[in-house]
């Protein structure tokens, strides 16, 4: 699913808007016809982001998609402290996700 044009288009738009360090595809769902129905992305962003809620809101408002998607945010320092801790969601993302950007 890493090569899905809809997912890649959203990842590209996110990269243009906020220049994250990394975008990782966490998961996706398809219907009985193997058509994409939703997906979830992790964004690893700079520690300098002033307001994570504002960034999240602006991305959801500015990026239009016919397919529902969710975003999970980590600052670089949060990501670095959690990605190697087995059992954390960051560890799971690192080990099972697909890097789309960065």
Enumerate the predicted regions with their spans.
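Catalytic core of pol beta-like nucleotidyltransferases
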Residues: 1-22, 30-36, 46-102
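A short acidic/basic microdomain associated with nuclease active sites
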Residues: 27
């Amino acid at each position: 699913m890493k090569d899905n044009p809809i997912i890649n288009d959203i990842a590209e738009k996110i990269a243009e808007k906020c220049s994250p360090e990394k975008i990782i595809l966490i998961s996706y769902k398809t219907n009985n016809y193997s058509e994409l129905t939703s997906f979830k992305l992790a964004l690893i962003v700079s520690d300098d982001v002033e307001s994570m809620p504002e960034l999240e809101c602006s991305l959801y408002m500015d990026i239009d998609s016919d397919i529902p998607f969710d975003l999970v945010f980590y600052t670089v320092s949060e990501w670095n402290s959690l990605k190697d801790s087995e059992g954390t969601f960051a560890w799971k993302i690192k080990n099972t996700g697909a890097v789309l950007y960065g």
